[in-house]
């Protein structure tokens, strides 16, 4: 979409500086701020009057420039042809829409475990007046944090399920001190990698996020995972360095890690006043003022134009650094920088907002949620720098002209349709989370277009069924507030509507559907059975849990007839086993954890397979010709298997193509090497033949299964195992013990860092080699070490391991199948 060049000049400090100009979209392009044409601006106290908007020289508007190489925006770098552009929006925002959306925010809070997300959420609710008392995580006062509403969450001190709430915040205009009320929807997400699906579905429907980092630990394994998820859904983020009161806090090291480890241009917009226990407030580098939290629980804000001498010089350096970073990603600041002119406070703030919304920059805030410092200023930053719902580009797929039989293959070729958050437009919403509530299924919905009303009839696009909305509520953690209607850009919940996570709902006047969220594959499994006689509660619980959580899978092993549950880690499965005991009064016995091995191919293989069966009367005939080849995972969709139909001339009637596709996916369910699912394969159908009488869908499905198995033998199949990124933190004196322990488990050290009396080691280790590691680490560090791990990828097992797995699988097969 963007053409031209990024200027590269030498600044007054004799350092190369890449200056990026803001991209100007054509009249047909839909940019991230596509609704600005309707008067929607988004900063604090934004106005639709011309005086409040940045005036851009028309000559500059005619320039086309490419964003600087340091920018991480995921937008196209070349101009798209007009035929590739989404059609213009069919509806426009009214003045009421503009007024409502301008002061609305939908944000998530995400981070590595124990970075202080839930503590921050608790302070946000307290300062916005949503709760009257502050309660801490782990339920030390027998109450626990508001957003951790499960007993298990309060006992373990971790967030297991994402929790949604809403609040109002009166943001302060830094220029005149006036107040403006903003409505904010907040979703607090888990930090543990085992519950990563909660982060996925939250980010899928949010307009912005707060990335929380520990001032001591910095960027950790789950931080990089959250960063990747934010990029997947193009979610702008502001960063908050929490725990600034801790000994060893070093915010400047963390800012540098955001730039280097997360590859996100970032700069501090604040400098802490005081360190560790002496933390009193922050210096606002943008508006050049000192901000202090005083009074009980930091509720009283004192603003001073006098910067403390102890941090004045550092603040000047960091403000200059902020301007330099902005000059690399924003045209206006870049031009001022090259002309050696100092931008005004307003110009800096506007540039931060533009660059943040365009995914090119992350402003970094600082504070301590536990010590009630910096949270109110962070809320002001949410209002000033993160987008409102109209400033996010939201596209839907128009299914009007799609053939249901081949809709999946046509969808990627269908032009996307922009959705407009106009209240009068046809309703479009996405169900992103399900819960079993006291009054039936609770379905969380993000309304993207139109208005959702109680007792309204809506259509599930996936099933084509019409349903009535019997009850509509807004959620405050586990509390509900009944409402009659809710407008676009809002998040709500419906009772009594049966659906699946990721379903699109409309009012029946449109044929739009939205892409669902990315669902990672499980990496660990174990056998489970009820203790004693099986009860209906056992199957009822399993059915409910796998409906609520797409990463929790249940199946029956055909050989052993055991019930197998699969998930993202040991803790993930342990939590569900414990919930079965507590919520369904069902004690369970579990087997040893099993690693989720996979099979794949390493080379292309042709097939020309004929399925014939004659039983007297109508027989079966189908012939399929084509090839299979290795396929890399698509980083955006997560898909690593694909079916392609290249048949021309009607050699296979189109009504049999879906049967071929079904046969391919059925063949992937169980590989011939170890009986595990097959991944990383593209199936290409080139030709075939049929019989006017004997051909059927069954015949083509069986022919495809036979063809795939025949080709798999020639494609040099291998076995894959999950490899984990393991993050170990321990006192420096135990460094050799930790490294030695990882080496004995065939781990590869990819990074290490020593700071003060503590060190961190990051290694890649096969999950199969990680069982029992917690006991080993505890023994080798005298109980002072801790580790976390997250799934990285599947990699080939060693040849001797593959041989053992194949031999073990062969022993389970009946003699007739060997």
Curated annotation (Swiss-Prot):
Keywords: Elongation factor, GTP-binding, Mitochondrion, Nucleotide-binding, Protein biosynthesis, Transit peptide. Coiled coil: none annotated. This is Elongation factor G, mitochondrial. Residues 1-23 form a transit peptide. Belongs to the TRAFAC class translation factor GTPase superfamily. Classic translation factor GTPase family. EF-G/EF-2 subfamily. Residues 102-390 form the tr-type G domain. Its main location: mitochondrion. GTP binds at residues 111-118, 188-192, 242-245. It is found in: Mitochondrion. GO terms for molecular function: GTP binding; GTPase activity; translation elongation factor activity. The gene is MEF1. It comes from Coprinopsis cinerea (strain Okayama-7 / 130 / ATCC MYA-4618 / FGSC 9003) (Inky cap fungus). Gene3D superfamilies: 3.30.230.10, 3.30.70.240, Elongation Factor G (Translational Gtpase), domain 3 (3.30.70.870), P-loop containing nucleotide triphosphate hydrolases (3.40.50.300), Translation factors (2.40.30.10). Mitochondrial GTPase that catalyzes the GTP-dependent ribosomal translocation step during translation elongation. During this step, the ribosome changes from the pre-translocational (PRE) to the post-translocational (POST) state as the newly formed A-site-bound peptidyl-tRNA and P-site-bound deacylated tRNA move to the P and E sites, respectively. Catalyzes the coordinated movement of the two tRNA molecules, the mRNA and conformational changes in the ribosome.
């Amino acid at each position: 979409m963007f053409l031209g060049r990024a200027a590269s000049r030498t600044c007054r400090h004799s350092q190369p500086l890449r200056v990026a100009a803001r991209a100007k979209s054509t009249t047909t392009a839909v940019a991230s701020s596509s609704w600005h044409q309707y008067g929607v601006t988004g900063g604090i106290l934004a106005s639709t009057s011309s005086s409040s908007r940045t005036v851009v020289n028309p000559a500059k508007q005619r320039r086309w420039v490419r964003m600087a190489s340091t920018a991480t925006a995921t937008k196209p770098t070349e101009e798209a042809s007009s035929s590739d552009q989404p059609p213009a929006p069919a509806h426009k925002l009214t003045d009421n829409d503009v007024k409502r959306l301008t002061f609305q925010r939908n944000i998530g809070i995400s981070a590595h475990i124990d970075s202080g997300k839930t503590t921050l959420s608790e302070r946000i609710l307290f300062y916005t007046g949503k709760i009257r008392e502050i309660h801490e995580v782990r339920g030390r006062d027998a109450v626990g944090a508001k957003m951790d509403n499960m007993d298990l969450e309060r006992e373990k001190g971790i967030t297991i399920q994402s929790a949604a709430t809403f609040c109002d915040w009166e943001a302060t205009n830094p220029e005149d001190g006036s107040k403006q009320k903003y409505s904010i929807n907040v979703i607090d997400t888990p930090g543990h990698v085992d519950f990563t699906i909660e982060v996925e579905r939250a980010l899928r429907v949010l307009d912005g996020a707060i990335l929380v980092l520990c001032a001591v630990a910095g960027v950790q394994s789950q931080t990089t995972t959250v960063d990747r998820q934010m990029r997947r859904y193009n979610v702008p983020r502001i960063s908050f360095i929490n725990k600034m009161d801790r000994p060893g806090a070093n915010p400047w090291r963390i800012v540098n890690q955001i730039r280097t480890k997360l590859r996100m241009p970032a700069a501090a917009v604040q400098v802490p006043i005081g360190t560790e226990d002496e933390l009193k407030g922050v210096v606002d580098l943008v508006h050049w003022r000192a901000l202090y939290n005083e009074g009980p629980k930091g509720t009283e804000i004192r603003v001073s134009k006098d910067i403390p001498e102890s941090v004045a010089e550092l603040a000047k350096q960091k403000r200059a650094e902020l301007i330099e970073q902005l000059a690399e990603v924003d045209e206006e600041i870049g031009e001022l920088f090259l002309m050696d002119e100092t931008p005004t406070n307003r110009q800096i703030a506007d540039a931060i907002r533009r660059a943040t919304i365009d995914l090119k920059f992350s402003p970094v805030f600082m504070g301590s949620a536990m010590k009630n410092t910096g949270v109110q200023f962070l809320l002001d930053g949410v209002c000033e720098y993160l987008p409102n719902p109209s400033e996010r580009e939201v596209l839907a797929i128009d299914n009007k002209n799609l053939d249901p039989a081949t809709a999946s293959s046509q969808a990627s070729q269908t032009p996307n349709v922009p959705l407009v958050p106009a209240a009068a437009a046809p309703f479009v919403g996405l169900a992103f989370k399900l819960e079993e509530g006291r009054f039936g299924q609770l379905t969380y919905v993000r309304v993207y277009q139109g208005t959702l009303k109680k007792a309204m009839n809506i259509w599930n696009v996936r099933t084509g069924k019409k349903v009535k909305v019997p009850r509509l509520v807004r959620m405050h953690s586990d509390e509900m507030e009944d409402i009659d209607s809710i407008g676009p850009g809002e998040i709500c919940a419906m009772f009594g509507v049966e659906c699946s996570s990721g379903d699109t709902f409309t009012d029946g006047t449109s044929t739009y559907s939205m892409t669902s969220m990315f669902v990672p594959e499980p990496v660990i499994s174990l056998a489970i059975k009820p203790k004693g006689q099986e009860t209906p509660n056992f199957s009822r619980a399993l059915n409910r849990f796998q409906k609520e959580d797409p990463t929790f899978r249940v199946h029956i092993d055909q050989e052993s007839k055991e019930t197998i549950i699969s998930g993202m880690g040991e803790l993930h499965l342990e939590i569900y086993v414990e919930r079965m005991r507590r919520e369904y009064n069902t004690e369970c016995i579990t087997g040893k954890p099993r690693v989720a091995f996979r099979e794949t191919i390493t080379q292309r293989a042709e097939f020309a397979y004929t399925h014939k069966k004659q039983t007297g009367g109508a027989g079966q005939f189908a012939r399929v010709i084509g090839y299979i080849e290795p396929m890399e995972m698509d980083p955006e969709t997560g898909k690593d298997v694909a079916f392609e139909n290249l048949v021309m001339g009607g050699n296979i009637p189109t009504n049999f193509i879906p049967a071929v596709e079904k046969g391919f996916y059925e063949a992937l369910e169980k590989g011939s090497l170890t009986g595990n699912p097959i991944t990383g394969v593209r199936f290409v159908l080139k030709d075939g033949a049929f019989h006017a009488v004997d051909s059927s869908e069954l015949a083509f499905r069986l022919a495809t299964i036979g063809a795939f198995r025949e080709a798999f033998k020639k494609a040099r199949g291998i076995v894959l195992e999950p490899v984990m990124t393991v993050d170990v933190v321990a006192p420096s004196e135990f460094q050799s013990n930790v490294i030695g322990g990882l080496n004995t488990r065939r781990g590869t050290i990819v990074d290490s860092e020593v700071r003060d009396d503590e060190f961190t080691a990051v290694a890649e280790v096969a999950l199969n080699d990680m069982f029992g590691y917690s006991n080993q680490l505890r023994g080798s560090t005298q109980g002072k070490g801790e580790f976390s791990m997250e799934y990285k990828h599947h990699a080939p097992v060693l040849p001797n391991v593959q041989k053992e797995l194949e031999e073990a699988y062969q022993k389970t097969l009946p003699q007739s199948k060997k």
